[in-house]
């Protein structure tokens, strides 16, 4: 595959106004994408965004570029990433575009594309778009320019879709739920979904102002929702990230329920209903406790590289349906084509209702093992992981941990760091083992 200049594993992302994230590039990107997408299909593209102040600027630039290439544009306004994927499918659009940097701060932004079926755009199409970016922008003739319209009922369509994933014979009546929208794209969606299903909802992180997205709220900053669940004596909390593709939960004791535990709940529920196809895909960072808990139920478990893109690839390769990351990206291919925080929350609530159980009861059989991560900086071009000293330290630790422990050593893809991760039954022992390996890495640096 050719080397990419613009697209990363999750579209284009960076600090606004520098590097690639400029209105100039967005205009050219819209035109280049329009050139590629106009070769077939409906010549219709949907654009959604999160609540960052820069979203308006990039939306206008993309809209102009796509129109200049002859594509019609349908604007959704602030909507979650999975909503763009869903409406791209239902409108039979040629593509969907999301303007978001997900869980990053407001001063970052990004652009990514969905294909007509709501999945991430094919690698070859991204390379074709990159090739067009190298050409001068030439506008189509005036009578061929694309038209721009707004999807006025986008919010209502997506709310109904989300609710459709909950059993029709059940309600959430009697449940008090804290919902944290991260001041992001779900602020006008998530509280409504859970209220319309019958829950009493206390919304936080639901007042975006353009610069407060993910700021001390949301799935990457759990302190506030944990405090609110306890203060309001709520049954549980649901925390989403800025673009709504990630979820973390909180039980009534104020304890965080992460992506691994959510995967366990969904797998158990699917197995109990006889609808589990194959097993569960996690990542190299998934807690060993998930692996062991699924083993006890004879549910296969496989690990992909870190990143929801790689989880999806392995799910498709194995023809399984459920997978995700401990960070809260949850994929259930029976309920969508991409990670969807609201839908994942609904599926957990459905499991609670079906089993007449609390969140604590559903996660109780899964023991989360202590996990320690140590980052070791190294200098030079050599690879510390090839050192005999490091290999010997790893072998010693793995021997002492046995089947109830795990060691993972990997290089950072962005910094000169070796990440040392150790899991086991006892935190102090795990910490000592991690430091032992880290010291070996340092001495080999």
Swiss-Prot record:
Disulfide bonds: none
Cofactor binding summary note: Binds 1 Mg(2+) ion per subunit.
Residues that span the membrane, as ranges: none
Residue positions where Phosphoserine is found in the record: 102
Extent of the signal sequence: none
NCBIfam families: glmM, PRK10887.1
Official protein name in the record: Phosphoglucosamine mutase
Lineage: Bacteria, Pseudomonadati, Pseudomonadota, Gammaproteobacteria, Alteromonadales
């Amino acid at each position: 595959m050719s080397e990419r200049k613009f697209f990363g594993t999750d579209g284009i992302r960076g600090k606004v106004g520098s590097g690639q994230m400029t209105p100039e590039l967005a205009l050219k990107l819209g035109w280049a994408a329009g050139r590629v997408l106009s070769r077939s299909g409906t010549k219709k593209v949907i654009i959604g965004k999160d609540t960052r102040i820069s979203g308006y600027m990039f939306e206008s630039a993309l809209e102009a570029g796509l129109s200049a290439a002859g594509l019609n544009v349908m604007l959704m306004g602030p909507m979650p990433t999975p909503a763009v994927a869903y409406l791209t499918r239902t409108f039979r659009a040629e593509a969907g575009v999301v303007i978001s940097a997900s869980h990053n701060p407001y001063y970052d932004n990004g652009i990514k594309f969905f294909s007509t079926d709501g999945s991430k755009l094919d690698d070859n199409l991204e390379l074709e778009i990159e090739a067009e970016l190298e050409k001068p922008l030439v506008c189509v003739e005036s009578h061929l320019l694309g038209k721009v319209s707004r999807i006025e009922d986008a919010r209502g369509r997506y709310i109904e879709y989300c609710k459709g994933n909950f059993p029709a014979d059940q309600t959430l009546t009697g449940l008090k739920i804290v919902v944290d929208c991260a001041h992001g794209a779900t602020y006008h969606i998530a509280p409504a979904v859970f209220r319309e299903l019958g829950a009493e909802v206390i919304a936080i992180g639901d007042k975006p102002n353009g610069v407060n997205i993910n700021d001390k709220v949301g799935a990457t900053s759990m302190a506030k929702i944990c405090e609110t669940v306890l203060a309001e004596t709520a049954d549980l909390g649901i925390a989403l990230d800025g673009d709504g593709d990630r979820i973390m939960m909180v039980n009534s004791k104020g304890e965080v329920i992460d992506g691994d535990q959510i995967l366990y709940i969904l797998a158990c529920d699917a197995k109990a209903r006889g609808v589990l196809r194959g097993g569960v895909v996690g990542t190299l960072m998934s807690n060993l406790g998930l692996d062991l808990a699924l083993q006890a139920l004879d549910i296969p478990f496989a690990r992909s590289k870190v990143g929801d893109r790689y989880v999806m690839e392995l799910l498709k390769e194995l023809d399984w349906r459920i997978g995700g990351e401990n960070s809260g990206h949850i994929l259930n291919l029976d309920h969508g084509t991409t990670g969807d925080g609201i839908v994942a929350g609904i599926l957990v609530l459905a499991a609670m209702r079906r089993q007449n159980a609390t969140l604590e009861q559903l996660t109780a059989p899964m023991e989360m093992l202590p996990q320690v991560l140590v980052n070791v900086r190294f200098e030079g071009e050599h690879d510390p992981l090839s050192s005999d000293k490091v290999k010997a330290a790893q072998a010693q630790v793995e021997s002492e941990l046995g089947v109830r422990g795990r060691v993972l050593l990997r290089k950072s893809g962005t910094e000169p760091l070796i990440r040392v991760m150790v899991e086991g039954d006892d935190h102090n022992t795990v910490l000592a083992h991690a430091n032992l390996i880290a010291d070996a890495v340092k001495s080999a640096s």
